[in-house]
């Protein structure tokens, strides 16, 4: 298949069709599996979630995967702590067309067993360390939680238990709190929002642009140089 040649002249390639674009997307995803970077969604904390929470998480997984497929530089995604007999898996099948054919890894094992601990960086808003860059040899871990089920420092403590490095998105470094009626400010984001930030930064190397992509106005933050 002459995907590489056609990619150079994508606008004029005679194979520029849905079938070709699907094959090109598959090629990019498989390249990411071998060259990185890798993103792990830790789904080992879903056993106490309600049906509503599981549905929200399944929807976030769908949006995350969809964004990754469209990315010019995709990540390779691994869903860990994820049993095919779990209610979340059933919800993913119900809500997400073609879920069983998603190009990603699925394992029941915990992320701390799947990957060498020294390669992991667990992303948690409770970390003291801002994420400065994305390293293609690193596995970035996002806790598979939703807003309604979040308990403070759960993911941070889990990473500490395994002596794994942690980092937080650099919201405090590039954004400021915006006054609002409810005085509400939160750095807790949905997993697809976290991914949108990581993906945008990986493509642009621009944190303000990336944060603007994933931190919605409802979180109570705006970029430092934004007009009030």
Regions found by a protein language model. Name each.
Residues 1-129, 181:
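RNA substrate-binding interface of SAM-dependent RNA methyltransferases
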Residues 48-50, 85-87, 129-132, 148-151, ...:
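Eukaryotic short linear interaction motifs
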């Amino acid at each position: 298949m002459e995907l590489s040649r056609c990619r150079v002249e994508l606008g004029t390639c005679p194979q520029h069709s849905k079938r070709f674009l699907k094959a090109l997307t598959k090629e990019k995803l498989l390249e990411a599996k071998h060259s990185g970077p890798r993103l792990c969604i830790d789904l080992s904390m879903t056993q106490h979630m309600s049906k509503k929470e599981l549905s929200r998480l399944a929807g976030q997984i769908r949006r995350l995967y969809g964004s990754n497929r469209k990315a010019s530089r995709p990540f390779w995604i691994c869903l860990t702590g994820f049993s095919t007999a779990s209610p979340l898996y059933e919800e993913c099948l119900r809500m997400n067309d073609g879920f069983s054919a998603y190009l990603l890894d699925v394992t029941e094992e915990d992320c701390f067993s799947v990957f060498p601990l020294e390669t992991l960086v667990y992303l948690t808003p409770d970390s003291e360390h801002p994420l400065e860059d994305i390293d293609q040899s690193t596995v970035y871990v996002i806790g598979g939680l939703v807003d309604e089920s979040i308990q403070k420092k759960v993911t941070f403590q889990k990473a500490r238990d395994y002596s794994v490095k942690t980092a937080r998105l650099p919201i405090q470094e590039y954004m400021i709190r915006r006054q609002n009626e409810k005085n509400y400010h939160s750095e807790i984001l949905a997993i697809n929002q976290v991914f949108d930030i990581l993906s945008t930064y990986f493509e642009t190397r621009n944190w303000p642009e990336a944060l603007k992509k994933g931190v919605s106005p409802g979180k109570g933050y705006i970029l430092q140089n934004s007009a009030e």
